[in-house]
């Protein structure tokens, strides 16, 4: 088993080496792709856009992103996936030969296990939702036309082009092995396809959001404690990252498994609070919400405010405080975009309309 994994990992190292040597000019492109594919952009950019254009798509997108990343966390704890940037330096596989030289980058040194790839899984799930939702909107209940078939081909070609670039990016940056990004893409699509058949997420009560948030946290914590009780160190990757990363400042606490867990749970609970708030009912369910200019105003205001909000980084000196603040910050993102911003704009535009009469 170990010998087979070593061969698989060696193939990944050779793939990374090949990309880094032959595509040096594409370094900035691969870094950009990796940054764009980060799940943070699904929360801060894609969600507010889709929610105010088509509410159900935005809700579905957020659920897929959150639950998909939760499954990614559990899979990583089970699979104990290595990462290229530390494996190539830590293994004795190359004891009888020279160790391949692998470059590291500021976005390389993630601290969680490597399998499956979170970037590949998140991008696959989120973009699958956007493609299938767009096709459903344009098709409606009519018989597919020639134009729709062309759109279908273009969107799916675009989808797979994105996945290919994300996968190559993660391999180039020595953050993942090839088999890990493939597993991520397949897992992300599976989660998105599953949620396309779940209708209860669109009218879930606040109680249901709270119960699901508690369940996801309780299961993850219980699973962590169970494995720890069995003598399994689930934070083994943090030591690897700190030991083998070229620069200490490249090791970021916000890439640890628990940081991801708290951010996702905060996002889900924030969505539940927003959708069940009186501010949401007064703004997004009123006559004003049907107007396209109002929706675009909500999108622009959300993107600007969330961009400023994203620049606020919780202090990471104390892990517990960092996790709590990350949870609160993440909960604020959907609450502001879904409830607070539309409510404020509705009040302002409503008063302006009254004065003009």
From Swiss-Prot:
It comes from the Eukaryota. It is a multi-pass membrane protein. Liver and kidney. The keyword tRNA-binding does not apply. It holds the Pfam family PAP2. CDD domains: PAP2_glucose_6_phosphatase (cd03381). Substrate binds at residues 83, 170. One of its GO terms (molecular function) is glucose-6-phosphatase activity. It comes from Mus musculus. Hydrolyzes glucose-6-phosphate to glucose in the endoplasmic reticulum. Forms with the glucose-6-phosphate transporter (SLC37A4/G6PT) the complex responsible for glucose production in the terminal step of glycogenolysis and gluconeogenesis. Hence, it is the key enzyme in homeostatic regulation of blood glucose levels. This is Glucose-6-phosphatase catalytic subunit 1. Residues 1-28, 82-117, 169-179, 233-254, 313-320 are lumenal. Residues 50-60, 139-147, 203-211, 276-291, 342-357 are cytoplasmic.
């Amino acid at each position: 088993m170990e010998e087979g994994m070593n061969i698989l990992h060696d193939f990944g190292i050779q793939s990374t080496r090949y990309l880094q040597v032959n595509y040096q000019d594409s370094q900035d492109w691969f870094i950009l792709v990796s940054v764009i594919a980060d799940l943070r952009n699904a929360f801060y950019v894609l969600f507010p856009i889709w929610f105010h254009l088509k509410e159900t798509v935005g809700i579905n997108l957020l659920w897929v992103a959150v639950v998909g990343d939760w499954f990614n966390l559990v899979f990583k704890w089970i699979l104990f996936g290595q990462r290229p940037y530390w494996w190539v330096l830590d293994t004795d596989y190359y004891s009888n030969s020279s160790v391949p030289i692998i470059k590291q980058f500021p976005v390389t040194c993630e601290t969680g296990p490597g399998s499956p790839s979170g970037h590949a899984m998140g991008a696959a799930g989120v973009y699958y939702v956007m493609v299938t939702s767009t096709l459903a909107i344009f098709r409606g209940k009519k018989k597919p036309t020639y134009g729709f078939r062309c759109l279908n081909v273009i969107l799916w070609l675009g989808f797979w082009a994105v996945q290919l670039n994300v996968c190559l990016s993660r391999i180039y940056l020595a953050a993942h092995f090839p088999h890990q990004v493939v597993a991520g893409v397949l897992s992300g699509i599976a989660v998105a396809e599953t949620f396309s058949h779940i209708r209860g997420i669109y009218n879930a009560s606040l109680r249901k959001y709270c119960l699901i948030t508690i369940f996801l946290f309780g299961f993850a914590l219980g699973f962590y404690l169970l494995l720890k009780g069995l003598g399994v160190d689930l934070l083994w990757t943090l030591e690897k990252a700190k030991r083998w990363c070229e620069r200490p400042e490249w090791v970021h606490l916000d890439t640890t498994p628990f940081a991801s867990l708290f951010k996702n749970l905060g996002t889900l609970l924030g969505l539940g609070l927003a959708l069940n708030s009186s501010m949401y009912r007064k703004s997004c369910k009123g006559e004003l919400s049907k107007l396209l200019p109002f929706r675009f105003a909500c999108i622009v205001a959300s993107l600007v405010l969330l961009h400023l909000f994203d620049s606020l980084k919780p202090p990471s000196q104390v892990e517990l405080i960092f996790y709590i603040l990350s949870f609160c910050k993440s909960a604020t993102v959907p609450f502001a975009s879904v409830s607070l911003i539309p409510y404020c704009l509705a009040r302002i535009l409503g008063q302006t309309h009254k004065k003009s009469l």
